[in-house]
Regions:
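Conserved beta/loop motifs at nucleotide-recognition and modification sites
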Residues: 1-267
Length: 267
């Protein structure tokens, strides 16, 4: 068991090892907040399993709204064409609703050539440990959670993304980017592209980040309340104007500012 409060990344590490060694399994569930990593490893899995140019014949997709056990069985029965494996991606289907018995029969007898991946994107993954299905997933599959990355790993990743643009960013500036824009990689990669296109020098500064990055609401609220204790009311008013320009609802703005002011009061 992972330490209390620490995310269990064992299935994530095992997935990376499987892809490196070429021993991809037959059954996976992908879920979690970090959509960038989920989509990245799904793409790596496709590249590892399916010959280039043959995806049309060996990659099968099924949306949750169209899911039927019969349809899944038909896809499972499709033999590979000029490939060792087929890959089936089922998106946003709640495994623990609907025909659980029929689904359990399929998952319990997957052919070796099939790699079946259930992807949770718009709906949360909530396992029901009491069901036979949960036992099958544990026995025959791998439930991979893509968690938000630790700050150290995220800083290294940000530095690599900037190096790909022939730019450099310091550790403290990378931390500031995370503070301002959040720690989800899809958001950060968009901001990195904007900053890279804007900055003229080879090394980024906080001024480059402030010039073009889109801040998250909480960061702007923190900047505003942080300007009040030293009496920098002009800056506080300027940041308040930025908050209004973000066109968030007044209730949400009050909630964020109230939270920051409570933290300021208790400090």
């Amino acid at each position: 068991m992972p330490p209390k409060g620490k995310a269990d990344n064992s299935a994530y590490r095992a997935l990376k090892k499987d892809l490196t060694s070429g021993t991809v399994g037959s059954l996976y569930v992908f879920h979690g907040e970090e959509a960038y990593l989920r989509d990245y490893y799904l793409e790596q899995m496709k590249k590892k399993l399916l010959p280039a140019g043959m995806e049309e014949f060996n990659l099968h997709t099924l949306a949750g709204r169209d899911f039927e056990v019969k349809k899944l069985q038909e896809l499972v029965d499709c033999l590979p064409m000029m490939s060792q494996r087929t890959m089936i991606v089922v998106s946003d289907y709640d495994l623990f609703k609907g025909d659980k018995e029929g689904l359990a029969q399929i998952l319990g007898d997957l052919p070796d050539y099939v790699c079946l991946v259930f992807v949770y994107d718009l709906i949360p993954y909530k396992a029901d440990a009491r069901t036979k299905l949960a036992g099958l997933l544990k026995e025959k599959g791998s439930v991979v959670a893509f968690h938000r990355q630790e700050q150290g790993d995220l800083i290294d990743w940000i530095a690599r993304r900037f190096r790909a643009l022939d730019k450099d960013i310091g550790t403290e500036d990378a931390k500031y980017l995370i503070f301002l824009c959040g720690d989800l990689m899809n958001t950060l990669i968009s901001e990195i592209g904007k900053i890279g296109a804007y900055a003229r020098g080879t090394r980024f500064t906080p001024a480059d980040i402030d010039a073009v990055a889109t801040p998250q609401l909480g960061a702007v609220g923190f900047q505003m309340t942080g300007a009040i204790p030293p009496g920098n009311f002009d800056k506080a008013a300027s940041v308040l104007g930025d908050l209004f320009h973000m066109q968030e609802s007044p209730i949400k703005l009050l909630s964020v500012l109230g939270k920051q002011l409570r933290q300021l009061y208790s400090a």
